[in-house]
């Protein structure tokens, strides 16, 4: 008992000494130290002390000391033979049009459990999506809210007193030319976007819009795992760049993972945002 008490007091003194040494460091010095760490290390450092957690969660610290830490990546999923493969590709607007890369690929065996992509990031969630078709003309107009490229707005049907919520998904509706009126500097500007094409073929024939980069580029990924590449289309400049993914879906890939024919394997994508901002 006496030895346990001595050991307990020794541990308490050690913790007290470490806490006092950390508290003696000025806040500005601590902020500069944390700012030199990568985002993952800063998130882990929040568990060190309340002071470090308070500094690393402060919006001023995140916006000023970590202006370039928030980054987006494109997650690509495909599931042949009950195996889930996930590819994470960081969005880099400075890449040339044709690049051969070997992206990181994670294999999740058949399991009903939820898998984490990163220890500190969000889980893979399956969000149910419902679609309803409404007949008749809508009347009136109202303010809308855009969430992840989907515009939600309130409307009502003829001879009905019930309000409904409509949605307009740009990623699925962008099959024809679109005219947008944008308010900039207290002036309405008309912007006309024509349907994009690649090698004289509409991009929609290759795939739908899978997301938008931070620079406003539309992301196109093929529906099936064939000639695996990603197209980034800039609607302002009407130009595109292509990123080829090598080492995915070829003969070596299939042999290495014990897979057969990859024809017809559908691809699913979503954007992932890494940021220090707390939810």
UniProtKB/Swiss-Prot annotation:
Domain F-box, chain residue ranges per copy: 19-69
Domain of life per record: Eukaryota
Disulfide partners: none
CDD domains xref list: F-box_AtFBW1-like
Stored InterPro entries: F-box-assoc_dom_typ3, F-box-like_dom_sf, F-box_dom
Coiled-coil region(s): none
PANTHER family xref list: BNAA05G37150D PROTEIN-RELATED, F-BOX ASSOCIATED DOMAIN-CONTAINING PROTEIN
The protein's name: Putative F-box protein At1g50880
């Amino acid at each position: 008992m006496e030895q346990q008490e001595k050991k307990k007091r020794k541990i308490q003194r050690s913790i007290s000494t470490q806490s006092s040494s950390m508290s003696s460091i000025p806040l500005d010095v601590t902020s500069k130290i944390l700012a030199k760490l990568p985002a993952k290390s800063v998130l882990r450092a929040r568990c060190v002390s309340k002071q470090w957690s308070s500094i690393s969660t402060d919006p001023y610290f995140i916006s000023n000391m970590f202006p370039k830490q928030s980054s987006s990546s494109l997650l690509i999923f495909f599931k042949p033979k009950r195996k889930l493969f996930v590819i994470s590709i960081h969005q880099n607007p400075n890449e040339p049009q044709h690049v051969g890369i070997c992206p990181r690929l994670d294999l999740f065996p058949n399991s009903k459990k939820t898998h984490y992509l990163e220890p500190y990031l969000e889980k893979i969630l399956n969000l149910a999506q419902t679609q309803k078709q409404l007949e008749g003309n809508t009347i009136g107009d109202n303010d809308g809210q855009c969430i992840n490229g989907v515009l939600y707005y309130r409307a009502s049907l003829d001879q009905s007193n019930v309000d409904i919520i409509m949605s307009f998904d740009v990623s699925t509706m962008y099959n024809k030319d679109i005219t947008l009126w944008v308010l900039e500097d207290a002036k309405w500007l008309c912007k006309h976007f024509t349907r994009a094409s690649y090698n004289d073929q509409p991009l929609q024939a290759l795939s739908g819009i899978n997301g938008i980069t931070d620079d406003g580029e539309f992301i196109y990924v093929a529906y099936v795992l064939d000639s695996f590449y990603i197209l980034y289309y800039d609607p302002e400049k009407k130009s595109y760049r292509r990123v080829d993914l090598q080492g995915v879906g070829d003969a070596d890939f299939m042999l290495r993972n014990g897979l057969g024919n990859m024809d017809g394997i559908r691809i699913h994508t979503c954007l992932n945002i890494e940021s220090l901002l707390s939810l």
